[in-house]
């Protein structure tokens, strides 16, 4: 029934497209010298990250993605999801004598999507001159082409003569991820007008495949051709100069054609005024050569747009028909399927399972696209890379909607492509799993989550995966946990509730996997370590001397003592604050991951304190800061678009974060979802629904959930042409801020919250941890004392004797991990004697060795652990 209804909707959409009107002839462009003047043009920048809509075909052979931002075509990725080629493709309209209007400068817009969310229709309105441009965006399932179908209409009550208007398409490019221009002119593009098929087709290309991302070995020469069903004249030139078509049209309302513009920041302008009627289709075709890109574009245009659109939409309808539909949530179908499709659309098509953190790069409009780094053009991957933690969150959405195949592909990507020889996962990677220029230090939750993913997706039974990947990851956690590297916000070291919650879940999953492979020693080691972390989580992260209550979770403790009067800088231009005053909702992961009950007194107290101190009410609903001490004093987080007054040091309201690495952090919609899951765990369904609605309201465009939402008074956009380093993009209280939208993590959170409301419980809470820590209460503990070797001792042989005491008859597991050489950890097992003593010869490496000893009593449900390094 649902499938039939969705198909009828698509046919209705096709019928609407088929009935669109058609447009009028334009004047012939003047001719001039073939080579454009003004090289290399103004500095190029990347793209606005607050997207209105995104899309790609479900067909894996069509390796092109489109995005729309500020009402016009924005980032277009091809042939991989991290390779951006377009700054903007937008229309310029002129009457040829009195005005020239540009979409982003002179028009307002609204945006809508089809039921899948993958086809986007933008209505741009020029109220002053009485016309509208209605444009639908898709990609061709059969090729690497973005298609735009546009109808020119008058506004209601207008007497505008549409036949007197001339329509131009202006393409501002940064092909192959760089755009040149300015002083450095790095990654310069070249533009030509191709006439091989008769009509003029502008082509912009870059054959450079070398950037400062030395591991990005999959880059290829990229050519981009702009063709149209009505193409009468075309020109290429340098942005911001006399050869820029916009400059010409603004000055004289006519286009002067140039056929060649080598090495610079290239713009192409094409007269696409329809020969008859008021309708035109544009094709942006890609290839590895000029001829191929032109051929690809023309082939896509040879098919009626309506038929291509139907094929495109039916691909997504078929995908959605295979998903699990939440019970009783029909009113949320659009949000649910949009979220599911955004997650699937965020997967690269060359590297299966490589699902990026976002189809946008934060504040791209302020990041230069024509500069060098280490002597090469600077690669700007940013969120279009793979982060293990984000991929886990995406995984939970995929599992919730029933796309187990993609969930497994994501898991295998992390283990097969990204995992380091030590067993750990890096902060992030390129699409091939190799280190990116911004790959930084380790984060233990990013090593823990993939183990949980393997267990929950049914991959734990794979022997090779266990031996070569899961076991080294779990060994690394035992040797380095509970505190190593930074927490989930990637800024602070210390003992973090959210990080340790992930470790507990990952090690519990590893224990079950080890047991299934007959490795009892490791099964005991992993579970005992997880139990030790669960037993001590409050000792490390709950303060009893803080200002906000008698006992509550803090963001993190720097040393494992949450009562210590230690202050630290929050970073990004934020203040320095006593650790006992810094709040964060990360402790809720202990509930979501089945390690503490929501009724736990410290959980309850902390929820109330977080609600009081780091939540903000907006017209869209309640949102939460990442962390802070007092929302009443303004944001203490410096990662975001600047606003004053706040606790941060930025000075220009609306300025983007990147140029100074400082700003003002805003509300994170994903944290409204996190708080909603705690409500749902308490049985507070109405509270959870209210927070879900806030997430929906915070969205940009057609329902894309952003990384951040603005919670301050409305702030207007800076005038067109303002300095990108300081310009405001315009903000509305309770709507998306400027960092990135959609955020894949947030889209997954929205999806799984809808699924959880349908199920009546949190669908991603692991059964394995719930059974161990909640259903029967946490297991008891055993005393473990290590008597030799002493911590810090120098060992001169390849083995050492580890001795100690514990409960008589306990099974003892001893892990030795050499953190210097990175050799595989070893696990030795023995049994405590009748007096509780144990002794075992353990192999050690030539570097610094971490020795971890655990003891387990069979059948008693009691475990204990000790640690010596």
Predicted regions and their residues:
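An extended acidic
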Residues: 33-125, 204-244, 315-325, 329
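Well-ordered alpha-helical scaffold segments within catalytic/enzyme domains
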Residues: 152-154, 321-328, 338-346, 392-405, ...
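Aromatic-rich carbohydrate-recognition surfaces in CAZymes
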Residues: 155, 182-184, 196, 206-207, ...
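Ser/Thr-rich low-complexity repeats and stalk/linker segments
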Residues: 779-869
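Long, well-ordered core segments of solenoidal/helical folds
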Residues: 343-351, 403-426, 459, 465-486, ...
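C-terminal capping/lid segments that line or modulate ligand- or cofactor-binding pockets
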Residues: 33-80, 394, 430, 437-454, ...
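Acidic/polar, glycine-enriched structural segments that form the non-catalytic walls/loops
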Residues: 31-40, 129-132, 140-149, 153-382, ...
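Extended ligand-binding clefts on enzyme/binding-domain cores
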Residues: 179, 201-236, 326-327, 331-335, ...
């Amino acid at each position: 029934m649902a499938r039939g209804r969705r198909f009828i909707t698509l046919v209705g959409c096709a019928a609407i497209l088929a009935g669109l009107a058609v447009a009028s002839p334009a004047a012939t462009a003047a001719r001039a010298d073939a080579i454009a003047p003004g090289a290399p043009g103004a500095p190029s920048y990347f793209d606005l990250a607050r997207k209105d809509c995104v899309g790609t075909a479900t067909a894996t052979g069509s390796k092109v993605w489109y995005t729309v931002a500020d009402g016009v075509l924005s980032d277009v990725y091809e042939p991989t999801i991290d390779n951006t080629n377009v700054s903007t493709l937008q229309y310029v309209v002129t009457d040829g004598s009195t005005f020239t209007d540009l979409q982003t400068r002179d028009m307002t817009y609204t945006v809508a999507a089809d039921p899948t969310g993958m086809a986007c229709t933008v209505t741009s309105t020029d109220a002053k001159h009485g016309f509208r441009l209605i444009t639908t965006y898709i990609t061709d399932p059969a090729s690497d082409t973005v298609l735009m179908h546009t109808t020119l209409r008058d506004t209601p009550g207008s007497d505008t003569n549409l036949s007197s208007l001339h329509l131009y398409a202006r393409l501002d490019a940064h092909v192959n991820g760089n755009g040149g221009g300015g002083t450095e002119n790095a990654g310069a593009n070249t533009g030509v007008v191709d006439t091989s098929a008769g009509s003029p087709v502008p082509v912009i290309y870059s054959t450079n495949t070398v950037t400062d991302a030395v591991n990005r070995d999959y880059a290829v020469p990229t050519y981009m051709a702009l063709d149209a069903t009505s193409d009468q004249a075309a020109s290429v030139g340098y942005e911001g100069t006399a050869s820029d078509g916009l400059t010409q049209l603004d000055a004289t309302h006519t286009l002067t054609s140039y056929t060649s513009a080598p090495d610079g920041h290239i713009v192409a302008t094409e007269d696409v005024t329809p020969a008859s009627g008021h309708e035109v289709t544009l094709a942006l075709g890609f290839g590895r050569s000029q001829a191929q890109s032109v051929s690809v574009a023309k082939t896509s245009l040879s098919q009626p747009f309506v038929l291509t659109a139907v094929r495109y939409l039916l691909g997504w309808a078929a995908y959605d028909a295979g998903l699990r539909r939440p019970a009783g949530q029909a009113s949320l179908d659009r949000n649910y399927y949009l979220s599911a499709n955004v997650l699937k659309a965020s997967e690269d098509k060359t590297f299966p399972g490589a699902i990026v953190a976002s189809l946008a790069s934060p504040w791209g409009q302020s990041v230069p696209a024509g500069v060098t780094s280490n002597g090469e053009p600077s690669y700007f991957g940013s969120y279009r890379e793979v982060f293990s933690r984000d991929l886990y969150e995406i995984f939970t959405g995929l599992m919730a909607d029933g796309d187990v195949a993609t969930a497994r592909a994501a898991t295998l990507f992390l283990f097969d492509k990204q995992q380091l020889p030590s067993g750990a996962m890096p902060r992030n990677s390129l699409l091939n799993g190799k280190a990116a220029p911004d790959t930084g230090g380790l984060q233990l939750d990013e090593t823990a989550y993939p183990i949980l993913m393997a267990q929950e997706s049914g991959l734990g039974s794979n022997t090779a995966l266990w031996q070569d990947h899961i076991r080294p990851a779990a060994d690394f956690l035992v040797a380095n946990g509970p505190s190593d590297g930074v927490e989930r916000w990637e800024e602070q070291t210390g003992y973090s509730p959210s990080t340790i919650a992930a470790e507990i879940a990952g090690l519990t999953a590893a224990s079950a996997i080890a047991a299934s492979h007959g490795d009892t020693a490791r099964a005991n080691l992993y579970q005992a370590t997880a139990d030790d972390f669960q037993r001590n989580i409050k000792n490390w992260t709950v303060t009893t001397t803080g200002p906000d209550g008698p006992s509550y979770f803090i963001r993190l403790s720097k040393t494992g003592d949450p009562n210590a009067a230690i202050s630290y800088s929050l970073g990004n231009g934020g203040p320095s604050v006593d650790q006992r005053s810094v709040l964060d909702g990360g402790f809720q992961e202990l509930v979501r991951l089945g390690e503490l009950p929501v009724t736990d007194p410290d959980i309850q107290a902390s929820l109330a304190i977080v609600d009081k101190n780091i939540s903000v009410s907006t017209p869209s609903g309640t949102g939460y800061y990442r962390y802070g001490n007092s929302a009443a004093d303004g944001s203490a987080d410096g990662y975001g678009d600047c606003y004053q007054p706040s606790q941060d040091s930025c000075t220009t309201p609306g300025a983007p974060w990147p140029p100074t690495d400082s700003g003002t952090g805003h509300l994170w919609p994903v944290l409204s979802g996190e708080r909603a899951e705690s409500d749902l765990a308490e049985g507070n369904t109405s509270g959870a629904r209210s927070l879900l609605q806030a997430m929906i309201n915070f969205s940009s465009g057609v329902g894309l959930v952003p990384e951040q939402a603005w919670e301050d008074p409305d702030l207007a956009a800076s005038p067109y042409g303002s300095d990108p380093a300081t310009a405001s993009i315009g903000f509305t209280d309770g709507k998306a801020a400027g960092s990135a939208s959609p955020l894949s993590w947030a889209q997954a959170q929205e999806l799984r919250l809808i699924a959880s409301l349908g199920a009546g419980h949190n669908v991603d809470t692991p059964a394995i941890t719930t059974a161990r820590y909640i259903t029967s209460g946490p297991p008891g503990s055993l005393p473990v004392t290590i008597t030799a070797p002493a911590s810090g001792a120098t060992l001169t042989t390849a083995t050492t004797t580890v001795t100690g005491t514990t409960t008589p008859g306990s099974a003892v597991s001893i892990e030795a991990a050499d953190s210097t050489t990175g050799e595989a950890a070893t696990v030795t097992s023995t049994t405590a004697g009748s007096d509780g003593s144990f002794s075992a010869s353990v192999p050690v490496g030539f570097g610094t060795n971490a020795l971890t000893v655990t003891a387990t009593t069979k059948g008693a449900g009691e475990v204990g652990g000790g640690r010596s390094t």
